[in-house]
Amino acid sequence: SVATRLAGQRRTSPAVAVPRHYRCNDGNGDCRNPSMKTDNVVVDENPPLPRFAQIEPIGRCNLACRMCTVNERIDAVGEMSIDRFRSLLDQLPGLETLHLQGLGEPMLHPAFFDMVELAAARGIRVSANTNLTLLPPARALRCVTCGLASLSVSIDGASREVYQAIRRKASFDKVVRNLDRLMRTRAEHRSRLEVRG
């Protein structure tokens, strides 16, 4: 784990000079040959942990958008357990911003809002992307009360025909209703959730 590897390292370790190798035309394709032109650059042996992370909580989606390859993945697609998510947060103690997104639809994950709450409770600014097809009233309420800072809604078309030609398996009217519900719920609860399109 990241934490295990870094546990014994001092944050004030000295920087070291390492060779920078240039591409070369030495005829034999050995462009990593140390006898080739090099100079020294200073590199910190213990770079700081990231302040931003993007995590894919789930690797599947309820749509079949024309431009997306999620339904053609050959890797094992599943969902991240809440324990694994908590472990990742533990390994990234300096995290300031977290974006929950990948190829999958984050709101398909049964513990999506729990993940947001876990991260937000640590002072992490959490954002996510969504196709907004899965937003009954109870989920709209969770959206504005769980600590989510920003939600980007993917709407690829201003008309029903264009949208549904791109976002296959989605209903334009349903997404517009869900967006309206989200905005009304946000106003009712005076939520600071940023909603972006």
Residue ranges, per PLM feature:
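Conserved alpha-helical substructure of the radical SAM core
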Residues: G29-S150, E161, A165-I166, D173-R177
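Short, low-complexity intrinsically disordered segments enriched in A/P/G/S/L with frequent Arg
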Residues: S1-V2, R10, P14-C24
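A general structural signal marking secondary-structure boundaries and capping sites
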Residues: E72, A170, M183-R186
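Flexible loop/hinge segments that line or gate small-molecule binding clefts
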Residues: A158
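Conserved phosphate-donor/acceptor-positioning beta-strand/loop module used by diverse small-molecule
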Residues: V153-I155
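Conserved strand-turn element in the central/C-terminal portion of the radical SAM core barrel
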Residues: V126, T130, L179-G197
